[in-house]
Regions:
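Nucleotide-activated chemistry modules centered on ATP-dependent adenylation/adenylyltransferase
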Residues: 1-36, 43-383
């Protein structure tokens, strides 16, 4: 039996939701700046997108006058189950938007091939990312998203970015969110992108608020949010946000994200997925753990050259040993072989519809070009 207190809480939540959706409509109608919604496929960005959709759908069609772009960033090394889920969702969003006459289009951005993870790690020999040398975030996440936003700014003059971030997630995030607030408005200035503003409609939500909204409200594009909940339970994870500046925390704990991430000691989300039945992903976990082992101070010199990429040798202070440079060419060839073997194993055991390319053909071509020009690999080790 439902208590009076629970009934009152439900009524207050419904009332708050009505007020929030009215607020969203007011912000939408206040100017001609198009919206760009950052969508990672996780609970927070799904909640924000669903809220925006339901609020704007309540407007007359003639009032839905400015475009809303749903932007998803694929690093090309995302966990395969997440990539497939997002691809299916983006297709469903575009189909539903067309059916409902919504001004919404969904698209995915990816890194430039020359900036991709494997081109840098296997092609150029960059060591696996670490807290001290996290070369990946800007190349894989920030730059592709920012390029899209800059193009929209060039086209429209200014844009408003909708981010599904919550101040309760961390003190750092709360501080960043309040730092650039524009007094008297719902918007903040973007910290690095001129012409871009930020709107955070679920800023005050708790994690319970997010799940309550998702499980009590049907997805406008007819996805089942219980599937999203099941995915979280299987991975016991958070989500990697769309990262558009260096102040926004990227992944680095138990979150959905890049399966190659070595910034953390253990990939708890991937381990949990494997333990909960997704054992076809185990070759990825094994390869990720090998990359992490190359950061072991006692073993670094097994894998890395004593010279930098430009041929110089660098010492720190009075140290007698040099700072390790890129991965040795012979180890890069070994890594490529292991990556292609992992791809074969994963696809041989993947459930129907879950097959994936761990490395793109274009990346292999760029690796071949780099190896020929920098290593004199005319024997073509890539083939």
């Amino acid at each position: 039996m439902t208590s009076n207190n629970e009934t009152d809480q439900t009524k207050r939540a419904a009332l708050d939701l009505v007020v929030l959706q009215e607020h969203i409509r007011a912000v939408y109608a206040a100017d001609d700046r198009p919206w760009v919604i950052g969508y990672s496929g996780g609970k927070d960005s799904t909640c924000a997108l669903q809220l925006i959709w339901s609020a704007i759908r309540a407007l007359p069609e003639e009032a839905r006058r400015k475009p809303i772009f749903v932007l998803s960033s694929d690093t090309l090394v995302e966990t395969p189950v997440i990539v497939n889920y997002i691809d299916e969702t983006l297709a469903a969003i575009n189909a539903a938007a067309a059916d409902q006459n919504m001004p919404i289009t969904a698209q995915k951005v990816v890194p430039e091939i020359s900036d991709s993870f494997w081109v840098n790690l296997i092609g150029r020999g960059y060591p696996a990312p670490s807290k001290r040398f996290r070369w990946c975030t800007e190349r894989l996440k920030i730059d592709p998203a920012n390029a899209f936003i800059k193009n929209r700014v060039a086209e429209y003059g200014e844009v408003v970015m909708i981010l599904g971030v919550r101040s309760s997630e961390s003190a750092t995030r709360a501080q960043v969110m309040s730092l650039h607030k524009i007094d008297g408005t719902a918007l903040s200035r973007h910290s690095t992108l001129p012409g871009a503003f930020v709107f955070t409609p679920i800023e005050t939500f708790s994690v319970d608020d997010v799940w309550a909204f998702l499980l009590q409200n049907q997805s406008p594009w007819e996805s089942d949010n219980r599937d999203l909940l099941a995915m979280y339970r299987n991975a016991q994870a958070g989500e990697c946000p769309l990262v558009v500046d260096k102040q926004t925390e990227s992944c680095g704990n138990s979150r959905f994200g890049c399966w190659v991430c070595t910034v953390v000691t253990k990939d708890k989300a991937m381990e949990a997925l494997v333990e909960n039945g997704e054992d076809w992903l185990e070759p990825l976990l094994d390869l990720r753990d090998e990359l992490a082992e190359t950061q072991n101070p006692e073993r670094k010199r097994e894998f890395r050259d004593f010279r930098r990429r430009d041929g110089s040798v660098t010492f720190v202070g009075d140290a007698e040993t040099s700072i390790p440079g890129p991965y040795l060419f012979k180890y890069r060839k070994e890594l490529l072989r292991k990556l292609l073997e992992a791809q074969q194993q994963v696809n041989a055991n993947a459930p129907p519809g879950e097959k994936t390319d761990l490395i793109q053909i274009e990346e292999l071509r760029e690796i071949r070009r780099i190896w020929r020009s920098e290593q004199g690999d005319w024997g073509d080790a890539v083939s």
